[in-house]
Amino acid sequence: MAEIKAFRGLRFTDKAGSTGEVCCPPYDIISPEQKKQYLAENPHNIIRLELPKTAEDTDEAYGKARAYLNEWLDEEILKCDEKPSIYIYEMVFDALGSSYSVKGYVSLVKLEEFSKGIILPHEETLSKAKEDRFNLMCATGCNFSQIYSLYMDDDNKVFTLIDNASKGVPDKQFTDPDGVTHKLWCVSDEAFIADLASKMADKKLYIADGHHRYETALRYKKFVAENKQDVGTSEYVTMMLVNMENSGLVVFPTHRIVRDLENFDVNAVIEKSKDYFDIETNLSRTDSTAKLDKAYKDGKKAFVLYCDGKYTLMTLKDTSLMEKLMPTASKALRELDVSVLHTLVLERIFGIDKENMANQKNLTYTRVLDEAIEAVDNGSADCSFILNPTRVSEIRDVALAGEKMPQKSTYFYPKLTTGLVMNKIFD
């Protein structure tokens, strides 16, 4: 099963500046303007290496990232730890009116093809994003950020082990602009590392966030094997590993925004939907949110259509309909809210096919409810769909069935910060 390994983490030294100034959110949620802001605050921010190329840059940006990396290594702005270590990582945050803590650990994980069933994906990926990550790995030979993965540990033995090893003052700690406190402990004790590896040896891993980076790491592993004598740690990738039963795991919904449809008629859409859904129209925002939440708690498949200032709750009448529409899919996949929306509404009623969805021609995504509403109100979108979050158990069940959810089915919050610890693949 999963093989984990300690590594000599590449970390910023005090020469770089404060920890909070050199870390940033994941590259794929940072705009060119935000990148400039991070670098204005501190020119050593990890975004200079992790996101060298934006829409404004050419492919030469990857080479520049390598040059900066070498410069920072020479100046000891970045430095590898002396001993192979496991890095215990905790995020403390507020969400949905409550306080949470999620604690896991960062290690190397041996790369495995998905077909082996050891490391399991749950979402589809886009080729453009993978090409960018591959070019960056080839240029720098580093994992700058971690793949976020989950494992099952019903008796909590792994968590107890890492929790006991992180009782002292963290090696690094900062609070980001969103109010999330990030803590990191470096543990090099060989007995601890061996015990952790043993406890993980029977476990499957479920990728929560970072599918593009994992598939890129698989490709890079093959590239190195074919082109280099020294493979370094290219047969591994860095992951943040968290118990699937951790009470701090928070998944936000990702809402759908539909735009640029020809002859869009919301009344016709609602009329067609009545064959498949129980419809409640003319709801207020407050009522629609409350009813959507109740549907979630009751295990019903539902979402809210927003158009012309009106909220319409759509609740699937009969889940057996999805079996007819997705006959080869598992029960876990076809009964997801996003599967019902994509297959029954977007494809069947709206006529938006899978390729269109992948290219985001008529469909875009946001986790911010106000953005989904504002896009309709300002006329840039025809309508939007407000969804409930996907359950962690649903992610597990789809992955175990060997299937993948539609893109943007999950949004784990908070996102892992980038810059606390990295992996330099070659010494």
Give residue spans per PLM region.
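Surface-exposed, charge/polar-rich loops and edge strands
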Residues: 1-427
